[in-house]
Amino acid sequence: MFMASLELIRRLEFNVARALVGKPEVVRLAVIGLLARGHLLIEDVPGVGKTTLAHALAKSLGVSFQRIQFTSDLLPSDILGVSIYDGKTGEFVFKPGPLFSNIVLADEINRTTPKTQSSLLEAMNEHQVSLDHHTYRLPRPFMVLATQNPLEYQGTHPLPESQLDRFLLKIRIGYPDRNDEKEILKGAGAAALEQIEPVLSAKEVTDLQATTEKVRVEESLLDYVMAIVGATRRSPLLTLGVSPRGALALLRASQARALVDGREYVVPDDIKRLAVPALAHRVLVRARLERAAGSELEADAIVDALLQEIPVPR
């Protein structure tokens, strides 16, 4: 079972990496998010491949895909859908919005208002939408890939803590190195994106997600996760530590990373390598530190420093 899963995962990684040139670790994190039934927040400067990654992942799966461009005038109904009165039947009929897709690209999510941002909360957490006293289930698998520009860019609204906590991982792509950028200039990534065909079906994705949940986690590693999140709650550098949801996210992501590496069990390195992308966006840095440095980078550094102080299980 695990070897068959590994073959499917390798196929998916290879397909996506063709479009996102020179960023295999970023691709791996995106696949980890998918396997862990999580959502991905991709933050970076414009033009480094955030949207390309989302498109490549969606095109690699034989599932429905919708892109939502978040703007200042976007309304919750533009995302969730609306109930329309049918004159023939005398009843209201629900018309689903673009959120009712397997893979949803929420492009530049921090360019819309907090009210519209918060309309995603129920969908991301419970895989359902409640409107007009009715509950509508979302398709499975369901994954939101949200992109955002750094907050110093004009016209952005910071995501509230409740929204950030719904994202399994937050990643940055970064600039390509010289050789990879030359390949991009030659059109390598764009050509590959156009040619991408689905390599996994919806059933194969949900099977992989079920297999991920069966990856074994020793008791000592549960204690390790608890020690890490506990350290964030006690740190004098932070005003808000990691929630139980964050601890669960780190555990699920670690199980997915183990499966991606071809293992049926989690090792401490899985947890260590995912602690920053799984936890840093969930903490709040004290205001005096935010003034001294960018709060996002500072949060990464604080979580990493706390990690170094915690004994690793043997």
Question: What role is predicted for each listed range?
Answer:
Residues S60-K88:
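AAA+/P-loop NTPase substrate/partner-engagement loops
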